[in-house]
A protein has these predicted regions:
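Glycine-rich beta-strand-to-loop/alpha-helix junction loops that act as flexible
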Residues: 77-81, 207-208, 255-258, 390-398
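N-terminal glycine/serine-rich phosphate-binding loop of ATP-dependent small-molecule kinases
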Residues: 1-94, 219-228, 405, 411-413
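Small/polar loops that bind or transfer phosphate-bearing groups
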Residues: 9, 95, 99, 131, ...
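Short, well-ordered amphipathic alpha-helical segments that serve as non-catalytic structural scaffolds
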Residues: 52-65, 183-189, 372-377
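Short beta-strand-loop/turn "lid" adjacent to the catalytic site in phosphate-handling enzymes
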Residues: 42, 62, 66-98, 123-130, ...
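Active-site core segments that coordinate phosphate-bearing ligands/cofactors
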Residues: 6-7, 111-123, 137-149, 153, ...
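Short alpha-helix plus adjacent loop in nuclease-associated cores
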Residues: 100-113
Length: 440
């Protein structure tokens, strides 16, 4: 009998349920459900609707069982750094999104207790104002941690709601900025220094672990029973597993709402040069994902929403423009502006001529992203003291031929675009490995 597996891959802008199976040695997949995901602005803060998210998770499982009654297992991956605090096993609302500005006020205080250079040496995680370490400290200052009894990252929370088993998965935990790069566990010295309750940060679990089965009430609701397992719950970790590279250690670019450019390494690099370059050492499946976070398609997504046109139409508009001025896509001003187009125009006007048309603005975004990829690639080669001729691109951005061509131009490398659901494939690959009795 054909063995089917369900990957639930949720990004910051959408979620998808993808069923996968092996057919004559080839992985086949079918998307059975897709739903939008977006940030909610409430009382001046940016939040996730975690209840709607879980409802969509269940609806997608229901759709999967309707078409594929025999599903061997399922797993969930999502974006990193965000989490749910629990009291009496109930969420403490709101569930903030990483784009909320509440961390800005506490970052100096955290660094006065633990200078960033010291944090980086221990964790190897790059500075981002939204890292969980700053979010949790903001929660402590606001009194939210005092009432909390538990802490689960978003995918851990959703998996727990399905099977009733709480687990803290390694790859996603590393994104918090609280995991020691050498021990691969939450760092008690960091927790103690910041006054974070150690009981909420227990031993980590490796991807490829079976958590259990759907709880009876959930199974009845979705119309089927299956095993629930841990994949690499950080979507980028699953994406790297899903990229079919001829060279196992070739650089990759996971191109989605965020763009992550890096390479697999056996050991972390936590020296001062790496710290200054703001590269990160995130957990992978048996390796370190040494990479740089770049703003990514978020800027393009915001512009697309404002213009109300398709991504394909944006590409065609860009082709008509000779305007190629570059701006810093990683600047904090582009994280959650009220008006992305106005913010881009203002940034470009500060250093020269502003874009005259939307075509100019779009073309500038594409060139700026590709330029940033080129800079990050050169930093990667310098920091690792290695040289490569290829860059593998997966994710939504791999479908954008114009952006791929510009990336090849600015990196000076051969670009291998893989317009596949790399994250879902990595998620499925880990599940299949468990089913076959192997190790991940």
């Amino acid at each position: 009998m054909q063995k089917n597996y369900l990957a639930i891959d949720i990004g910051a802008s959408s979620g998808r349920h993808i069923v996968g199976w092996m057919e004559n040695g080839v992985l086949r997949t079918e998307e059975v459900y897709r739903f939008p995901n977006s940030v909610q602005r409430v009382d001046g803060h940016l939040e996730w609707d975690i209840d709607s998210l879980f409802a969509n998770v269940k609806q997608g499982i229901r759709e999967a069982f309707a078409k594929y009654p025999n599903i061997e297992s399922l797993s969930i991956d999502t974006w990193a750094v965000d989490y749910v605090l629990l009291k009496n096993d109930q969420p403490i609302y709101p569930v903030y999104t990483y784009r909320d500005s509440r961390t800005q006020a506490v970052i100096p205080e955290v660094h006065s207790i633990l200078p960033f250079e010291q944090l980086y040496q221990r964790t190897g995680i790059q500075f981002q104002p939204f890292n969980s370490i700053y979010q949790l400290y903001a929660d402590k200052k606001a009194g939210r941690l005092a009432e909390a009894e538990d802490f689960l990252m978003i995918p851990e929370y959703l998996l727990w709601k399905l099977c009733g088993v709480k687990a803290r998965e390694y790859t996603n935990a590393t994104s918090t900025g609280l995991v020691n790069a050498q021990t691969k566990e939450y760092d008690p010295e960091i927790l103690k220094a910041l006054g974070l309750p150690e009981a909420m940060f227990p031993k980590l679990t490796a991807p490829g672990t079976v958590l259990g089965s759907l709880m009876p009430n959930i199974a009845a609701e979705v119309g089927g029973q299956t095993k629930v397992v841990l994949c690499a719950t950080h979507d980028t970790a699953s994406a790297v597993e899903g990229i079919p590279m001829e060279q196992g250690d070739a650089p990759f670019l996971s191109s989605g709402t965020w763009s992550l450019l890096g390479v697999k390494l056996a050991k972390p690099i936590t020296n001062p040069e790496s710290c200054r370059a703001n590269f990160t050492n995130e957990g992978g499946v048996g390796y370190i994902r040494y990479l740089k976070n770049i703003m990514g398609l978020w800027i393009i997504q915001c512009v697309q929403k404002q213009l109300g046109i398709s991504f394909a139409e944006m590409v065609e508009l860009a082709k008509t423009s000779p305007y190629t001025r570059i701006f810093d896509v990683n600047a904090a001003r582009f994280s959650a502006p009220q008006d992305m187009r106005a913010e881009i125009r203002a940034a470009l006007a500060e250093t020269g001529e502003a874009p005259a048309t939307d075509a100019d603005l779009i073309n500038s975004v594409y060139h700026s992203l590709a330029y940033c990829y080129g800079e990050a690639f050169r930093e990667l080669e310098s920091l690792t003291e290695q040289h490569w001729d290829k860059l593998y691109i997966a994710g939504g951005g791999a479908k954008n031929a114009t952006l791929n061509e510009l990336t090849a131009h600015y990196t000076g490398k051969q670009v291998v675009a893989l317009p596949i659901e790399a994250t879902a494939i990595g998620n499925l690959k880990i599940q299949m490995s468990i089913s076959e009795g192997g190790t991940v």
